């Protein structure tokens, strides 16, 4: 979009896949030449701290960032500290809540369980849109859904993540969940070998979510998700209102869930960049 607007672009390559980044840059440069665009309209640089220097540089007039909440906040502060502050367009960490309404649970509990595990383990759970929080109303189909969810997780194979630091951060996130006195591990996937991440399913208490417990709002990058059971419609709406900003929010519903789904939609639109209906956020481009 920057190139389409007539702006030259400087990309800071990710240290986890520098060779892939270089191949991508070479392809873009070839396209620039073929299209007859000015030389230097696209640039790629490498380095650990060079991103901060880019944000400070007076020639840079806007910044796009994808990454952690802490990293995005740090770059935002740098952008605002410039003599002439510049905008930062950030796609930061999210837990992407997925809500399952009663009729959907009763109608397709097993299918939802299988599809949901496939979604939050896709690519080792490293999609920014991975559904990290599952909200389900207590109803007749809930126990069937939980049983199927646990069984699917138990059969899930461990995966190799992007690099060693990513795996280390995943394990740190898992350790933090395990240390929380009110979070329970519901299911574990097949045991992980050295350098692998095990699939995990946890359950937290709705009271902690309503109290905006920081840990329950923190993304754990990897193949896990957190289930929270909600008592009633009023409590579900309160939980949605208590959420921080999200990349996506997903709603699973059937015809009989229509009135509740309709009342949730404006709340979800306030919280998420994209709202999905009867789908999975890892399919969002």
Q: Where do the PLM segments sit?
A:
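Conserved small-residue-rich beta-alpha loop and adjacent elements
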Residues: 1-35
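General beta-strand structural signal in soluble alpha/beta enzymes
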Residues: 11, 44-46, 65-67, 88-91, ...
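Short gly/pro/ser/thr-enriched loop/turn and capping motifs at secondary-structure boundaries
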Residues: 16-20, 70-73, 95-99, 258, ...
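Conserved C-terminal structural/oligomerization subdomain of aldehyde/semialdehyde dehydrogenase
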Residues: 36-39, 60, 118, 134-136, ...
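A structured beta-alpha segment of the ubiquitous adenosine-cofactor-binding alpha/beta core
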Residues: 42-64
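Short acidic-hydrophobic, aromatic-tinged amphipathic segments that line or gate anion-handling sites
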Residues: 43-47, 100, 226-231
């Amino acid at each position: 979009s920057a190139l389409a607007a007539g702006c030259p672009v400087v990309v800071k390559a990710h240290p986890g896949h520098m060779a892939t980044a270089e191949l991508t840059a070479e392809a873009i440069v070839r396209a620039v030449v073929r299209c007859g665009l000015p030389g230097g309209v696209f640039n790629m640089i490498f380095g650990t701290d060079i991103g901060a220097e880019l944000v400070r540089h007076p020639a840079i007039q806007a910044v796009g960032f994808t990454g952690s909440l802490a990293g995005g906040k740090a770059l935002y502060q740098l952008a605002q500290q410039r003599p002439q502050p510049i905008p930062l367009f950030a796609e930061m960490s999210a837990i992407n809540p997925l809500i399952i309404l009663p009729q959907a649970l009763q109608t397709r509990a097993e299918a939802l369980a299988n599809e949901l595990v496939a979604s939050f383990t896709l690519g080792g759970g490293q999609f920014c849109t991975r559904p990290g929080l599952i909200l389900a109303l207590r109803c007749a189909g809930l126990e069937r859904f939980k049983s199927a969810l646990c069984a699917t997780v138990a059969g899930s194979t461990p995966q190799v993540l992007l690099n060693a630091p990513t795996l280390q951060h995943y394990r740190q996130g898992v350790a933090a969940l395990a240390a929380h006195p009110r979070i329970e591990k519901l299911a574990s996937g097949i045991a992980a070998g050295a350098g692998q991440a095990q699939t995990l399913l946890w359950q937290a208490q709705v009271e902690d979510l309503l109290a905006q417990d920081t840990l329950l709002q923190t993304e754990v990058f990897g193949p896990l998700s957190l289930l929270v059971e909600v008592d009633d419609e009023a409590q579900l709406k309160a939980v949605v209102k208590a959420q921080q900003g999200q990349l996506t929010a997903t709603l699973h519903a059937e015809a009989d869930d229509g009135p509740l789904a309709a009342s949730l939609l404006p709340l979800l639109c306030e919280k998420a960049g994209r709202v999905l209906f009867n789908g999975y956020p890892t399919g969002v481009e």
